A protein has these predicted regions:
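Alpha-helical segment proximal to the catalytic Tyr-Lys
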Residues: 120, 162-164
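Residue(s) in the substrate-gating loop at a strand-loop-helix junction
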Residues: 134
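C-terminal helical subdomain
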Residues: 167, 173-174, 193-234
């Protein structure tokens, strides 16, 4: 069980993609353990949570959203989790260039933009950063060039960031396998998990995010590969 740090005031956790899927599960977990979630998402959360609607592909909008939520939090974040992500399945030559590039802008550039903007507030809160990659960030598959490129990028970005911030801000790379979330909704049948697929529950992965946030000063969970015990994408 995660135990979030306490210091006599509510701790605030910035979560991208917090309106659905893993992000929403992490919002619930933060509240369950006594923290205050703050959400950036292109869609509003289904319940009353402090949030700003923004497209992570728009760096200027991201910077404004982070600053606005930092004001709500009193100028500090105890944690940042970059859960937002999109995909555009298909062979490279079949995916329109604009869609392909949007995946990289949201998943990779958006992750970096959020972390860059949030870093002063994370330092102020002596907080931690958890980025979200994927098992497809360490194992490539066909018809996923945009997603794999973006998530391999998140892996490299986070490893470099951890080295850059060592001893200053804790950084954890989360590498989840397939999850039972709306992420697969709207895909053609060939790109959806089969009915027999063993997918992790987002609530389980969210617990691991909070475990990273809850580590004592000087102790880092550098990388977490978390998936169903029968996950097909890893190893």
């Amino acid at each position: 069980m995660a135990v979030l740090p306490t210091s006599g005031h509510p701790h605030s956790y910035l979560i991208t993609g917090g309106a659905s899927g893993l992000g929403s599960a992490t919002v619930d977990a933060v509240e369950r353990y006594g923290g205050t979630p703050l959400v950036i998402d292109k869609n509003p959360p289904s319940r009353d949570i402090a949030h700003v609607c923004a497209n992570l592909a728009d760096t200027e909008a991201v910077e404004k959203a982070v600053a606005e939520l930092a004001d709500v939090a009193g100028g500090s974040f105890e944690g940042v989790f970059t859960a937002a992500g999109i995909d555009s399945c298909g062979k490279l030559e079949d995916v329109p260039a604009a869609q392909w590039e949007e995946v990289l802008r949201v998943n990779l550039i958006g992750t970096a933009a959020v972390v860059r903007a949030a870093l002063p507030y994370v330092r102020a809160g002596r907080g931690r950063i958890v980025t979200c990659a994927s098992t497809l960030g360490i194992k490539a598959v066909s018809d996923a060039t945009a997603y794999c490129a973006s998530k391999f990028g998140v892996v490299g970005f986070t490893r470099a960031l951890a080295a850059e911030l060592a001893g200053d801000v804790g950084v954890t790379l989360l590498i989840p396998g397939g999850m039972d979330t709306p992420f697969f909704d709207g895909r053609s049948a060939q790109y959806r998990p089969p009915s027999t697929a063993r997918l992790a529950k987002p609530e389980q992965i969210a617990e691991m995010v909070l475990s990273a946030f809850a580590q004592p000063a000087g102790c880092e969970l550098r990388e977490l590969v978390v998936c169903s015990s029968e996950e097909a994408s890893w190893p």
